[in-house]
Amino acid sequence: MTVLKNERYLKALLREPVDMTPVWMMRQAGRYLPEYKATRAKAGDFMSLCRNADLACEVTLQPLRRYDLDAAILFSDILTIPDAMGLGLSFGVGEGPKFARPVENKSAVQNLPIPDPEQELQYVMNAVRTIRRELKGEVPLIGFSGSPWTLATYMVEGGSSKAFTKIKKMMYSEPKILHLLLDKLADAVILYLNAQINAGVQAVMVFDTWGGVLGHREYLDFSLQYMHKIVDGLIRENDGYKVPVTLFTKGGGLWLEAMASTGCDALGLDWTVNLAEAKARVGHKVALQGNMDPSVLYASPARIEQEVQQILADFGQGSGHVFNLGHGIHQDVPEISPKVFVDAVHQYSVSYHQ
């Protein structure tokens, strides 16, 4: 059994007592750090960086050297699964992801292989093992995947989208084909996350970035149903510790009760949700992660501290809160801002845990 020096993050996700509120940042390993840009340049391109275990480890650890973070998150991408399915993923300079072979019909769905995590995605598992070794038990390591719905949006659209017309056309005109794809993706995500857990991640998160573009019934049928299947299929204890599961739907504030009923341990919240309200609605069932608007980091240190204090006050006394941004950190925030943010969370949260 690995002894963790800092268990704050895992304890908060399980709503166990902590000395202060734990904090990490979505996309904490990323383009806002000059050392990340240097490492990416060394790798050549984004996916080469993901596929090199030593470099992926290096960028995972970079933010921990600068800031007093309570967790590390695996440096990877949500599109590793569709890439391993053979869709021809590429990232153009300054562009989002593109797939050379989008999924457009039933035969394309039927022909998709379910990747073996220790074969086609072995580079991710190698990165997990390398990071765990180099962390030396300082903080827990978070693994992650995209949700089936979010992965499907990229696979059907052929890349990023604003209107999601292709996948919504499939959803309304040929729902059986989309359900077939989502079911296959859920199976792939279960295998992938369980392999990450076996390789050493100590908590997992499912990112449903685009669930919020769906109508009420469609969210339950085409997104949440498949995240529920994933939660049911995950390893929940490993190496003497429970392995907490966090679900995050951006724009998902309407569905907190339904999300909390999946059996997950925590819900990620974006900044459109009031934390006090969310706690009143589902705080008896799950922990909550979030939820400062990442754009606050453009503000003065005093304004950042004010926002942190407000969000801590919204959650109030007790455990069950992991402080985070409501989405990924922006790449051009002032260099001092993340430190001000992280230190403020620790400084001002102590009184809520006494």
From Swiss-Prot:
HAMAP family with a match to the protein in the record? URO_D
Q: Which gene encodes it?
A: hemE
Q: Which GO terms describe its biological process?
A: protoporphyrinogen IX biosynthetic process from glutamate
Q: Which lineage do the record's taxonomy fields give for this organism?
A: Bacteria, Pseudomonadati, Pseudomonadota, Gammaproteobacteria, Pasteurellales
Q: Which NCBIfam families match?
A: hemE
> Lyase: is it a keyword of this entry?
yes
Q: What class of enzyme is it?
A: lyase
Family listed: Belongs to the uroporphyrinogen decarboxylase family.
The subunit field of the Swiss-Prot or TrEMBL record says: Homodimer.
Residues that bind substrate: R27, Q28, A29, G30, R31, D77, Y154, T209, H327
Q: What is this protein called?
A: Uroporphyrinogen decarboxylase
Q: What EC designation does it have?
A: 4.1.1.37
Cite the Gene3D superfamilies for this sequence.
3.20.20.210
